[in-house]
């Protein structure tokens, strides 16, 4: 007699939720690679961050859904042409991730570890002297299940994203950064408040209710 394990039950429940998720269905219909596109879309529509003609850096970009959304924002007349929107691109997108993903027309992709100084140097070279209007970060570490260790890993990625933004953003630029509620969250909010003139915590509707995932948006760098 076979007994179903708890993990199998959990996996089946997750799969059922995923299949029936309205954002998963919408992503499939509209040609996005992942439902995550709607998280950035909701943040952008609420705050008006992304505009044609900008330079945007997408950190933790794989599988490319956020870059797809950015691509469509920079070519709005081509929004219905599929995942890798075609047409004239009014803006620049530089994407970075440890994992590779299928190319998106007009998106410059750098594969590498954000912790690696050589990779950061390559990213800085790609940006050049123009500076960046918006940095979006969907980076998340591989979680171990050990709360203290996971909190430290999450905090490090957020701190690195803030440091990168301080180096490359225009004074009125913005940083969108994924964080998680739990140990260390209040310290990350304080970090944003120290570095940005306006700080907006947002949990998009596309973020699952059961998830501790949320986003911090910092707008306008403070003078240091």
UniProtKB/Swiss-Prot annotation:
Cellular compartments annotated: Cytoplasm
Matches recorded under InterPro entries: RNA_methyltr_RlmE, RNA_MeTrfase_FtsJ_dom, rRNA-MeTfrase_E, SAM-dependent_MTases_sf
Predominant location: cytoplasm
HAMAP family from the UniProt entry: RNA_methyltr_E (MF_01547)
GO MF annotation list: rRNA (uridine-2'-O-)-methyltransferase activity
Gene name of the record: rlmE
Keywords: Cytoplasm, Methyltransferase, rRNA processing, S-adenosyl-L-methionine, Transferase
Keyword rRNA processing: yes
Organism this protein belongs to: Methylibium petroleiphilum (strain ATCC BAA-1232 / LMG 22953 / PM1)
Annotated active site: 178
Listed name of the protein: Ribosomal RNA large subunit methyltransferase E
């Amino acid at each position: 007699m076979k007994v179903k394990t708890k993990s199998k039950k959990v996996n089946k429940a997750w799969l059922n939720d995923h299949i029936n998720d309205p954002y998963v269905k919408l992503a499939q219909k509209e040609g996005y690679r992942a439902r995550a596109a709607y998280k950035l879309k909701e943040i952008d529509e609420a705050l008006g961050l992304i505009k044609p003609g900008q330079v945007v850096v997408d950190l933790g970009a794989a599988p490319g859904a956020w870059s797809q959304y950015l691509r469509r924002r920079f070519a709005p007349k081509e929004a219905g042409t599929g995942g890798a929107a075609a047409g004239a691109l009014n803006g620049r997108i530089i994407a970075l991730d440890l994992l590779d993903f299928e190319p998106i027309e007009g998106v410059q992709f750098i594969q590498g570890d954000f912790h690696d100084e050589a990779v950061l140097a390559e990213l800085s070279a790609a940006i050049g002297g123009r500076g960046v209007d918006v940095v979006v970060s969907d980076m998340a570490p591989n979680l171990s299940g050990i709360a203290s260790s996971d909190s430290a890993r999450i905090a490090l990625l957020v701190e690195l994203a803030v440091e990168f933004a301080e180096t490359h953003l225009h004074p009125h630029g913005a940083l969108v950064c994924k964080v998680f509620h739990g140990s260390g969250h209040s310290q990350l909010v304080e970090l944003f408040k120290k570095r940005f003139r306006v700080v907006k915590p947002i949990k998009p509707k596309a973020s699952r209710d059961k998830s501790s995932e949320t986003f911090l948006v910092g707008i306008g760098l403070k003078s240091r």
